[in-house]
Amino acid sequence: MDKRLLTIQDISCVGQCSLTVALPVISACGIETGILPSSVLSNHTAGYSGWTFHDLTEDMPKILERWLTEKVSFDAFYTGYVSKAQIPYILEIMEKAARPGALRIVDPVMADNGKLYTGFDEDFPQEMKNLIKDADVIMPNLTEAAFLLGQPYVAEGYDKAFIEKMARDLAALGAKNVIVTGVSFDPSKLGVAVYDGNKVEYYFNEKQAVSSHGTGDLYASVVAGALLRGKSLLEAASLGADVVVEAIKLTAGDKDHWYGVKFEQALPYLIKRLS
């Protein structure tokens, strides 16, 4: 039976993020991809003057009921931007629609640059802990890691001991494997710390001159797809970083393309790396 993944996150109709990234990227990895939209937005919330928003929480139990009737099941679950009220439904879906040994991959999307995103209150990190406590892989950035651990956000000046303690403390919340993104010990390098429950390893790229919207969603989607293709945790984490850098380079110089990265043009690179 071919592997099937369910990704649960919002649809921003324009803006190259969330489900509009996850579906094509994971499909390009050769994995059948089902979607469960958590909400629908006209566009993402970074840089636009406004947006529309439609919540889909009430649809989740109805969809699960239909899936159970049709005997629909999944080899993996990958969650992104979701609301506090949706987490209990998501946990039920992960329990009832799972094939044996199904992976739970959680990108705890809620914050960056020391602040929670618009729409999340200070209780949200506590609720997110319920989603990560039985996860196989979690992928917080430094800000999200700090919120999950109830610690102050440290943007720079940290060392390996700090990051490695952070990774182990996150695993102590229940996650089997941890990828901390946005790690840097050198101003010219940016990368990830990868903890497999035993040791912490690192992978770095040259730091790009621009900061781009949607790269976190691209990264998490590549990692999820690569894991389902049988790549190791470090291999998947490294490939995700390389694909993000490739997409940023393909977008560089196009001032009109401020809202995301041209990840579509990086898909041949991703496919080649997986072959």
Predicted regions and their residues:
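Charged C-terminal helix
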Residues: 234-275
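Short pre-catalytic strand/loop immediately N-terminal to key active-site residues, enriched for Gly-Thr
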Residues: 13, 200-213
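Fold-independent oxyanion-binding glycine-rich loops
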Residues: 8-11, 38, 80-81, 107-109, ...
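Conserved phosphate/ATP/ADP-binding segment of small-molecule kinases
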Residues: 118-201, 210, 234
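Conserved N-terminal subdomain of the carbohydrate kinase-like
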Residues: 2-106, 110-118, 266, 271-272
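Short, small-residue alpha-helix embedded
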Residues: 210-233, 237
